[in-house]
Amino acid sequence: MNFLIVGTIRNCQRQIFQTIKCLDKGLYFANKIEYFFVESDSDDKTLDSLKKLSRQKKNFRYESFGRLRTKLPIHTQRLALCRNRCLEELKSKKNSWVDYLIVVDTDGVCRNINSQIIRKCISEKGWSAQTANVKGPYYDIWALRHNTWSPNDCWQATKKE
């Protein structure tokens, strides 16, 4: 099993190390793992952490869009640009080896990944995507806008309840 792990990253200078450690441990059974992260608008030392990881791990790469806030003031627009870059990376010919794409959060929510559960889920037939779950509100759903799936602003909906 070969995994390309991607994600967007901003202001995660410390959390990224724990995230990578967690993923390496949880996917120990993989034949191949490569990491690709897209950074923008960090105010901390995230870029230094990414540089350090890319020197330490041959399978770790990243790109930085620098300051997008001035060009794209809306957070979801910046996220979309960075996520689309991750998808472009997946589609590139150099990644034809990829069996599975894993999109991760890099802000410290990645903990205690159970490799047995991952293997079991992957072995199931008939799926195109699998998603993780967390306790409590999950902010990423806010970025999803679709006329059928999520036509409203989830935070506005929770305020009305």
What positions do the PLM features span?
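Conserved catalytic core of nucleotide-sugar-dependent glycosyltransferases
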Residues: G108-E161
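Alpha-helix termini
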Residues: K25-A30, K57, E89-V98
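Hydrophobic targeting segments
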Residues: N2-G7, L23, E34-F37
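Short, well-formed alpha-helical segments that are part of the catalytic scaffolds
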Residues: C12-L27
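Alpha-helical elements of Rossmann-like donor-binding domains used by nucleotide-donor carbohydrate transfer enzymes
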Residues: Q18, C22, S49, L81, ...
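Conserved donor nucleotide-binding strand/loop of the catalytic core
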Residues: K51-R85, S92-K93
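Short beta-strand-to-loop acidic/aromatic patch adjacent to the donor-nucleotide binding site
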Residues: N95-V109
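A conserved acidic beta->alpha catalytic loop
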Residues: Q13, V38-S49, R67
